[in-house]
Amino acid sequence: MAAKIKKGDRVVVLAGKDKGKQGAVTQVLVKANRVLVQGVNLVQRHTKATQADPQGGIKSKEAALHVSNVAIVDSKGKPTRVGFKIEGDKKVRFAKTTGEVING
């Protein structure tokens, strides 16, 4: 199945503690059907000191969200579903609300 959400897409969170927050997708975990969104769903992780990080301590990092809990933001700033259509000889993604082609 083609990816409806890709790295770099601007998305909004639909459910959970960060509902309504927007951010860019930094990573897509295809097998787990999850995405990492920049600045959203932050969790605290306790890390040991290492040579790379001699300080250690409590660090904040993004946790993955299920793809069903995020939606792409269209050009008007509203969440939209994604469809596919053929333009010429290419398959492209488009926003169902506006019909505009999504870059990427």
Curated annotation (Swiss-Prot):
It comes from the Bacteria. Belongs to the universal ribosomal protein uL24 family. InterPro entries: KOW, Rib_uL2_dom2, Ribosomal_uL24, Ribosomal_uL24_CS, Ribosomal_uL24_KOW, Translation_prot_SH3-like_sf. One of two assembly initiator proteins, it binds directly to the 5'-end of the 23S rRNA, where it nucleates assembly of the 50S subunit. One of the proteins that surrounds the polypeptide exit tunnel on the outside of the subunit. One of its GO terms (cellular component) is ribonucleoprotein complex. This is Large ribosomal subunit protein uL24. It comes from Caulobacter sp. (strain K31). GO terms for biological process: translation. GO terms for molecular function: rRNA binding; structural constituent of ribosome. CDD domains: KOW_RPL26 (cd06089). Signal peptide: none annotated. Part of the 50S ribosomal subunit. The lineage of its organism: Bacteria, Pseudomonadati, Pseudomonadota, Alphaproteobacteria, Caulobacterales. Keywords: Ribonucleoprotein, Ribosomal protein, RNA-binding, rRNA-binding.
